[in-house]
């Protein structure tokens, strides 16, 4: 490995995202430690060390981060800024070389992103992290990974075109706009490659957000593929993204959190948000050596989702 990273602490190491990152880092030869809540009963992946503590205790976290070269947050959504501050403060205080906040979203760098409840605290957490690194003046740096909707997860609940349980398909603004979607394993491997320092990636990714995608797909494309692999037709439902967004804002203001996902459609397809508009231009795929999925691989993913839903 041609980077200074050897020891890595992970917050959220037992979740779907965190466990994949942990396993990939272990396979890459890193020493991995899971930072868990004091009362956690979840089992960490084999080979991962566990430290249980109060995640709001900056002093305890700082001690836990001593000797760690990188800290990665794989905390699940929703991200709440106040819950991020203690570990960020501790990581910077401990002089951790590379700090990776939990983003894993679409275009968090868009000036409009902070207006969306679904990512506002991710935007603010990154800003807070940068401020702390600047204030401290040590050698800490940050990076983040943004990957669009997770391929396996979004197919499971019908968030990107076909819904295998209801046999419906949602098209937003016509359903033809491409968006980047990424396999969890590709996110994990990208992080590992950067921290290994392959091809100078460790330095190149310093203080940057890395945008990647396993596939560039549209809702209409996925629906047609779903019809092919299932042999069944999906009832198409058309939605105007701006109308969905305004409706979500009104309901969210009344305390309805069920509209949470509707804000993500604005992030993906809304004008000026840089989701479908700019993800390919921002892509780090070539730099990190990430090959996009073939049609067959996408169809295999759709087939698996259909089987899990009991459609085939």
Language-model region placement:
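Conserved Rossmann-fold cofactor-binding substructure of NAD(P)-dependent oxidoreductases
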Residues: 49-70
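NAD(P)-cofactor binding segment of oxidoreductase domains
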Residues: 66-101, 121-131
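Universal eukaryotic N-terminal targeting presequences
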Residues: 1-3, 311-312
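Conserved Rossmann-like nucleotide-binding pocket used by diverse enzymes
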Residues: 9, 51, 100
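Short glycine-/small-residue-rich Rossmann-like dinucleotide-binding loops
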Residues: 55, 76, 104
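Oxidoreductase cofactor-interface core, primarily capturing Rossmann-like NAD(P)-dependent enzymes
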Residues: 2-45, 56-59, 81, 94, ...
């Amino acid at each position: 490995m041609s980077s200074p990273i050897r020891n890595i602490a992970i917050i959220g190491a037992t979740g779907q995202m965190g466990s994949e990152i942990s396993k990939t880092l272990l396979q890459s030869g890193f020493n991995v430690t899971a930072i868990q809540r004091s009362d956690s009963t979840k089992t960490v992946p084999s080979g991962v060390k566990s430290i249980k503590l109060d995640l709001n205790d900056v002093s305890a976290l700082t001690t836990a981060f001593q000797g760690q070269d990188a800290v990665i947050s794989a905390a699940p959504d929703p991200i709440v800024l106040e819950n991020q501050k203690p570990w960020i403060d501790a990581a910077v205080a401990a002089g951790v070389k590379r700090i990776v906040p939990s983003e894993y979203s679409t275009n968090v760098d868009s000036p409009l992103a902070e207006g969306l409840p679904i990512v506002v605290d991710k935007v603010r957490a990154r800003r807070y992290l940068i401020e702390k690194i600047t204030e401290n003046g040590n050698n800490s740096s940050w990076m983040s990974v943004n990957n669009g909707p997770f391929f396996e997860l979004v197919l499971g609940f019908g968030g990107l075109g076909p819904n295998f349980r209801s046999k419906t398909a949602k098209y937003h603004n016509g359903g033809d706009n491409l968006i980047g979607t990424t396999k969890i394993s590709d996110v994990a491997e990208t992080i590992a490659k950067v921290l290994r320092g392959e091809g100078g990636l460790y330095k190149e990714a310093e203080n940057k957000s890395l945008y990647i995608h396993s596939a560039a797909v549209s809702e209409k494309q996925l629906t047609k593929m779903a019809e092919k692999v299932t042999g069944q037709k999906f009832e198409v439902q058309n939605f105007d993204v701006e109308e969905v967004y305004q409706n979500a804002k009104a309901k969210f203001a009344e305390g309805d959190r069920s509209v949470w996902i509707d804000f993500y459609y604005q992030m993906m397809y809304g004008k000026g948000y840089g989701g479908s508009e700019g993800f390919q231009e921002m892509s780090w795929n070539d730099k990190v050596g990430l090959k996009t999925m073939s049609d067959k691989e996408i169809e295999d993913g759709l087939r698996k989702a259909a089987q899990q839903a009991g459609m085939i």
